[in-house]
């Protein structure tokens, strides 16, 4: 599929094309900050456009976003880059609803509209707790929050109480990415037996993550133990730790059993992998809840973006369930890793049932989040139109 090319002038032309639409044509707008955004939007967009027959606008900062060439006639797509055109888009936005998975609205350069009462909806891009993985106040300026589970509701309500904030609309939504993965599992699982020894390594972003701490040693141990290895660093790691990435490339890219993934893990590889090794990456919960399978957690310090997270009394979900959905391994005992991986299938049924139970208590509307979210958006539009 050939994707369009854009110059700076064409980015502004795209913005003008969006702004030329009638308000009714841009009643529902989605904004994608990066390639991962569509993982969290897809099922909701499909429900709105294909099931409810509603028109939406899809505005993206991703130059090669496949949605720019979507054949769906209910979607109008626009590329606005990530510079001054994007800043103006937010400042002068006229739309009924804007759906985003980007936190920190109105905290830095991404502002609420100064000219129109847009209703802002936030979709989480992780199941982790609000007060531990986001900056303080990251979602304060949204009108509605699509909550993954009861932990988000409890955390947001306590945050509002502690800081005297205006109550937000909280929708018992779920996690669209998990729904997509569970649906994909029916088609992909056990379709490629050549990948049965594939190990996914998914470090989080920031100082002291597993890649920085022990990544090279870990990859070396796994490859020497005849495992296939896919390393998928956080996308910001390629920018901020370029020297480390170069070292890894030079050392391992000649090995046919090693893959360095720069984007989203391809579904076929994700669903045919043997296990995941992570530290504090949100994808670890996605993996555990999709396959009802233990994750191996390397015990490195957790990055806390919110230095005042202890103002909220609730233990973060990623800490409280960590030892129940996975095995925690010290970076000083990596030699145990191959045997630990081979032993993961022991007590398989018991672990499966335990993780299923945790999933049911942690995530709302498993398999149905898009229906819940689309109904809320439809009702909101109907309310706006009746006023």
Please place each PLM-identified region on the residue numbering.
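Catalytic binding pocket for nucleotide-activated donors in carbohydrate/polymer assembly enzymes
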Residues: 139, 167, 282-361
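Conserved catalytic-core segment of nucleotide-activated headgroup transferases in glycan assembly
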Residues: 39-53, 170, 176-249, 331-334, ...
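Membrane-proximal basic amphipathic "stem/tether" segments
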Residues: 1-27, 34
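Donor nucleotide-activated moiety binding/catalytic core segment of transferases
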Residues: 82-86, 242-285
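C-terminal alpha-helical cap of glycosyltransferases
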Residues: 366-387
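A nucleotide-sugar donor-handling region in carbohydrate enzymes
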Residues: 2-13, 138-211, 235-238, 352
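Short acidic-hydrophobic, aromatic-tinged amphipathic segments that line or gate anion-handling sites
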Residues: 77-83, 258-262, 325-333
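Active-site and donor-binding regions of nucleotide-sugar-utilizing enzymes
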Residues: 29-182
């Amino acid at each position: 599929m050939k994707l369009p090319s854009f110059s700076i002038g064409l980015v502004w032309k795209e913005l003008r094309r969006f702004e030329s639409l009638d308000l009714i044509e841009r009643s529902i707008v989605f904004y994608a900050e990066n390639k991962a955004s569509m993982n969290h939007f897809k099922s909701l967009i499909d429900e709105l456009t294909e099931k409810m027959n509603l028109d939406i606008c899809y505005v993206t900062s991703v130059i090669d976003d496949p949605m720019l060439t979507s054949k769906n006639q209910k979607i109008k797509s626009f590329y606005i880059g990530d510079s001054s055109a994007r800043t103006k888009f937010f400042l002068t936005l006229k739309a009924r609803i804007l759906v985003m998975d980007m936190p920190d609205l109105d905290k830095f350069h991404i502002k609420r509209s100064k000219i129109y009462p847009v209703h802002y909806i936030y979709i989480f891009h992780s199941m982790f707790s609000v007060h531990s993985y986001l900056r303080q106040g990251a979602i304060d300026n949204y009108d509605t929050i699509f909550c993954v589970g009861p932990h988000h509701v409890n955390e947001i309500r306590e945050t509002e109480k502690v800081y005297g904030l205006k109550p937000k609309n909280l929708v018992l939504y779920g996690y669209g990415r998990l729904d997509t993965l569970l649906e994909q599992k029916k088609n992909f699982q056990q379709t490629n037996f050549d990948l049965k020894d594939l190990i996914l390594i998914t470090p989080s972003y920031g100082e002291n993550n597993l890649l920085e701490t022990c990544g090279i040693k870990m990859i070396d141990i796994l490859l020497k133990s005849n495992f296939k290895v896919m390393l998928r660093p956080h996308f910001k790691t390629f920018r901020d730790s370029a020297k480390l990435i170069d070292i890894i490339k030079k050392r391992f890219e000649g090995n046919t059993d090693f893959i360095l993934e720069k984007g989203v893990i391809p579904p076929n590889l994700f669903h045919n992998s043997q296990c995941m090794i992570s530290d504090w990456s949100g994808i670890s919960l996605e993996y555990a809840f999709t396959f009802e399978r233990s994750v191996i957690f390397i015990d490195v310090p957790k990055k806390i973006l919110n230095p005042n997270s202890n103002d909220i009394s609730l233990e973060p979900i990623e800490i409280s369930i960590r030892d129940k959905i996975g095995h925690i391994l010290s970076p000083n005992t990596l030699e145990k890793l191959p045997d630990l991986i081979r032993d993961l299938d022991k007590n398989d049924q018991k672990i499966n049932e335990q993780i299923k139970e945790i999933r049911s208590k942690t995530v709302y509307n498993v398999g149905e989040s898009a229906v819940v979210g689309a109904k809320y958006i439809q009702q909101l539009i109907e309310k706006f139109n009746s006023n």
